Design a protein with these regions (language model features):
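Alpha-helical scaffolds that organize eukaryotic protein assemblies
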Residues: 114-117, 129
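EF-hand Ca2+-binding helix-loop-helix modules
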Residues: 1-49, 54-94, 101-111, 125, ...
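C-terminal interaction modules of eukaryotic adaptor/scaffold proteins
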Residues: 139-169
Length: 169
């Protein structure tokens, strides 16, 4: 959905309680209508990525940001899936590069394997979106610790646990 008017109408339908915010459960149900099935934990991570006021829900403006991200990731998937309906690891790597991520080989293979639910070397759209959400969340959190913008951070154990818990899916 690209048109803001259409997005607003969609958002208002999902916001059944008319609070101006949608919950993870409401967002999960709405995404399922569009054939995007995600575990609640992934939807909660989507909200955390764009929840600028940190209230645990998603306002319309926050939703617009998520929608833009999802459209970009879906387009990359569509461009690379070559009519198969899934990506192979080489496609996933290219897709990550096209979405602005750069991972070294060990990191890439670990992430790719962890999002290959069936362990068959095929990443479907929902898994690719989940993978991109994880990498984006990790990048956002890493950048918050990388105060000198050197591309390196030092974490004590408590910070590591905090980091890990915030990137969980």
């Amino acid at each position: 959905m690209e048109n803001k008017t259409i997005l607003r109408e969609w958002f208002e339908r999902v916001d059944s309680e008319k609070t101006g915010n949608i919950t993870a459960t409401q967002l999960k149900s709405a995404l399922a209508v569009g054939n995007l099935e995600f575990p609640l934990s992934v939807v909660q991570q989507m909200i955390r990525m764009y929840d600028s006021d940190r209230n645990g829900t998603m306002s319309f403006d926050e939703f617009v940001g998520l929608n833009k991200f999802l459209l970009k990731v879906q387009q990359v998937f569509s461009d690379l899936q070559r009519g198969r309906g899934y990506l192979v690891p080489d496609d996933v790597y290219e897709g990550l590069v096209k979405t602005g991520f750069s991972l070294d080989s060990p990191s890439f293979h670990t992430v790719c394997e962890s999002f290959d639910r069936k362990k068959n070397g095929r990443i479907h759209l929902d898994d690719f979106i989940s993978l991109c959400i994880f990498v984006q969340s990790a990048r956002n959190l890493f950048n918050s610790f990388d105060t000198t913008k050197q591309g390196r951070v030092t974490l004590d154990f408590n910070q590591f646990v905090y980091f890990s818990a915030n990137c969980r899916i």
